[in-house]
Amino acid sequence: MRPTGGRGAHRGVWQFGYMTTDPVHRSVRLERIENSRYTAINERGGKISIGTGDGTDFTPVELLLVSIGGCTAVDVDLLTSRRAEPDSFEIVVAADKARDTTGNQLTDLLVTFRITFPDGEQGDKARERLPDAVRKSHDRLCTVSRAVELGTPIATRIE
């Protein structure tokens, strides 16, 4: 079933049951490879293996952490590398997986930035810009972090 009208209506080509040309619409699909193993495929053909953590495949929780880290990495890199290219750039995203009477959840989510810049005036400018870039990514720019923090509703549909 294809969405019609309202927020689900887009102009373009249908792929994976959704439009692909709308610049604000995003879609991925998952294909089952075997019991508890899947391949996620984006609209551009990129693939990621997903599993339960028994092998090297990413778990869904790890992919959420990757999404948060990747989103903020792009923001912070764009805002700071205008001043100077980093000497090193690493972001670590960690959380505790908890279970209570309401179900599974993540707690104590922490994003740690380990970024260094070269010595000199341009590196100094990038270092000075870093705290503001991190704040802007967290407060406004990172769609993934904002969706998690704001509690974006998730609808489901069976076709």
Q: Where are the predicted features?
A:
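Extended beta-strand/beta-hairpin segments
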Residues: 12-66, 76-159
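Compositionally biased, low-complexity flexible segments
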Residues: 1-11
